[in-house]
Amino acid sequence: MLLCERQEIAEFMPVYLKYLFKQGLNLSSVQIINCHAFNDISSIAEKLPLVPGSEQIRKTVFLADAVPGELQKRKSMLNAVRSSTYFSKMEYCAHFFFPGKKSPKRWQQGYFEDMLLQSLDRSIVETGAYQNFYNLTEEYLLCVNNSRGQDKPLCNHSRHLLYAYFAATENFVGMHLGEAALHGAFNLNHSAFDDLKDLLKQL
């Protein structure tokens, strides 16, 4: 079971799991749940037994952004696992913070979209147009940030950059990240996914 902190993560994971299956990774049946937030994981744990098929779950992974509050999220997850009767029956519980690991014992500080931005497929627009599109998008976001002022900067820059960039393309305008991934916006074989793939192999 994959417990996702945000809708974008929950929408992307089925696409990535399908890709891994096509690459020969034999994953058992995976249930994906959008928890919306991990502020109160204990309450989430109480509701999980009510989800159809939850009694068959043996392994759980928490998927969340490293910011804000990686340390607090990790503590909440550990407390929930230790105190929950449901989680205590699991063979395996783990967490993964996007965009991935900085070192074997440290996570990069960032967001899910930071990982996707690294893997953006440059071939999705006409040859030579990628850098122009990208630069124009960066300039647009810079103008938006300047207009918001120093007190209210854009949060999760990569997310805004991806959606603004897709709006300038014919193939991905109006799509959410999961849809864009399904239609080939990202190179799912990119090294940015290595940490996530290694974790999913353990399911």
Named regions from a protein language model:
Residues I9, V67-L71:
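Short acidic, S/G/P-rich loop/turn micro-motifs used as interaction or catalytic elements
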